[in-house]
């Protein structure tokens, strides 16, 4: 019987929860925006973890995203140390932060769909009169 939920997935999910907490509570950099950890992909050998983040609010410009990624890269050592303490792993993966644009794309697509539906209602309303 194959495992439906592998160890790397479980570790990735736990890392996502722990990193969300640590970024919100432990990083005291005032330049850091409202960061949401959307996913963590852990390599099979647990040597690397790709952490996907979004930046909420007005910080949606490319410069703000880059600045937030730089801050997180600078704090990666501290975050690894804290993860090691809280998760009790023998070796904590190297953290690589990436911006997850899927949330922004989803919002843009929703707006396009809503606009198309509104225009369709407007056109069908004129056709019936």
Curated annotation (Swiss-Prot):
The keyword Cytoplasm applies. GO terms for molecular function: ribosomal small subunit binding. Its main location: cytoplasm. Pfam families: RBFA. It comes from the Bacteria. GO terms for biological process: maturation of SSU-rRNA. It is found in: Cytoplasm. One of its GO terms (cellular component) is cytosol. Keywords: Cytoplasm, Ribosome biogenesis. Signal peptide: none annotated. InterPro entries: KH_dom-like_a/b (IPR015946), RbfA (IPR000238), RbfA_dom_sf (IPR023799), Ribosome-bd_factorA_CS (IPR020053). Belongs to the RbfA family. Monomer. Binds 30S ribosomal subunits, but not 50S ribosomal subunits or 70S ribosomes. One of several proteins that assist in the late maturation steps of the functional core of the 30S ribosomal subunit. Associates with free 30S ribosomal subunits (but not with 30S subunits that are part of 70S ribosomes or polysomes). Required for efficient processing of 16S rRNA. May interact with the 5'-terminal helix region of 16S rRNA. This is Ribosome-binding factor A. It comes from Azotobacter vinelandii (strain DJ / ATCC BAA-1303). The lineage of its organism: Bacteria, Pseudomonadati, Pseudomonadota, Gammaproteobacteria, Pseudomonadales. The gene is rbfA.
């Amino acid at each position: 019987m194959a495992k439906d939920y592998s160890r790397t997935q479980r570790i990735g999910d736990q890392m996502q929860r722990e990193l969300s907490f640590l970024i919100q509570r432990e990083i005291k950099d005032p330049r850091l925006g409202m960061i949401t950890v959307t996913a963590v992909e852990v390599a099979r050998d647990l040597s690397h973890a790709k952490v996907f983040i979004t930046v909420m609010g007005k910080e949606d410009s490319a410069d703000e995203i880059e600045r937030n990624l730089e801050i997180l890269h600078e704090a990666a050592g501290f975050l690894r140390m804290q993860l090691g303490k809280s998760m009790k792993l023998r070796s904590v993966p190297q953290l690589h932060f990436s911006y997850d644009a899927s949330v922004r794309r989803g919002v843009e697509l929703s707006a396009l769909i809503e606009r198309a539906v509104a225009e369709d209602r407007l056109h069908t309303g004129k056709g019936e009169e």
